[in-house]
Amino acid sequence: MGNICGKPELGSPEEIKANQHINSLLKQARSKLEGEIKLLLLGAGESGKSTIAKQMKIIHLNGFNDEEKSSYKTIIYNNTVGSMRVLVNAAEELKIGISENNKEAASRISNDLGDHFNGVLTAELAQDIKALWADPGIQNTFQRSSEFQLNDSAAYYFDSIDRISQPLYLPSENDVLRSRTKTTGIIETVFEIQNSTFRMVDVGGQRSERKKWMHCFQEVTAVIFCVALSEYDLKLYEDDTTNRMQESLKLFKEICNTKWFANTAMILFLNKRDIFSEKITKTPITVCFKEYDGPQTYEGCSEFIKQQFINQNENPKKSIYPHLTCATDTNNILVVFNAVKDIVLNLTLGEAGMIL
């Protein structure tokens, strides 16, 4: 019997060859992880893609400094004033009356400012917005916001009007996350995780921007496709006859089954779950999915919608990785992105013949 503590044998030629193969795979895996991992954010307009990109900056790049936060003030003020103007105009269109003592404020918002707001939220303008937000007519109009185009952040900024109208106001990270501006062109966020470089590419989602998507399709490790769960009862900004959820389903089918992404991980973010959970208590998802006959609950409805998207996949060998998300909730996105990171890193290693 040989000495088990003696010098190890080199092994048979087969064992040596197998060991060399393993070392080669490890080298390939290390090389892949040291390379750049490209994540492509896709989805229709208003689905929350840009908010996800902002969260990556908060989570992985030390957030926004004061100068960067300050640069969002004008956007936030434009969102706030613009949203109130939308409500005032919608009230008139829907023939919902505004209190007599608030009609002058409504006129100033709708007529005097028009589309020429200069980005300065004066004390007088803030008071007009505060008074109108408390007006029963504006509240009734807000309850019917599925009938017109209103930013998701409207109520958040109206409720914060005293704070955001202070002379020394500096936007918080939450204020920045909720700010909305149309994404045009291509915006990239680069960050490091576990010695791997991630490049997240955000491309505008509205129809006019989608022609730019093809420029980003090469060397993509994973697609993160964002869908706004809460928009099952809304129409597109670009086309007021097309349901937003149906547009997202059609778009996901195209992206999921394109030859460009035949071997690319497909991650599905079912976003705005917080707004969705409130909305389904008032508006059934049958306004979009007439065939749905399940319970009108968050769990039942979200599971049904998730399955509708998974069913768009025509490749039985391709996996879809769905997640319910709230893009404005940093803790939720941290947890979800940790799962995404593990999926992506495992798939990257898998391509080299190794699994974590």
Curated annotation (Swiss-Prot):
Lipid attachment, kind N-myristoyl glycine: G2
Residue segments, region G3 motif: 198-207
UniProt-listed InterPro entries: Gprotein_alpha_su, GproteinA_insert, P-loop_NTPase
Binding site for GTP: E46, S47, G48, K49, S50, T51, D152, L177, T183, G205, N271, K272, D274, A327
Keywords carried by this UniProt record: GTP-binding, Hydrolase, Lipoprotein, Magnesium, Metal-binding, Myristate, Nucleotide-binding, Palmitate, Transducer
Region (G1 motif): 38-51
Region spans: G5 motif: 325-330
Cellular component GO terms held in the UniProt record: cytoplasm; heterotrimeric G-protein complex
The keyword Repressor belongs to this UniProt entry's keyword annotation: no
Molecular function terms from GO: G protein activity; G protein-coupled receptor binding; G-protein beta/gamma-subunit complex binding; GTP binding; GTPase activity; metal ion binding
Assembly information from the UniProt record: G proteins are composed of 3 units; alpha, beta and gamma. The alpha chain contains the guanine nucleotide binding site.
Family: Belongs to the G-alpha family.
Physiological role: Guanine nucleotide-binding proteins (G proteins) are involved as modulators or transducers in various transmembrane signaling systems.
Descriptive protein name: Guanine nucleotide-binding protein alpha-1 subunit
Source organism: Dictyostelium discoideum (Social amoeba)
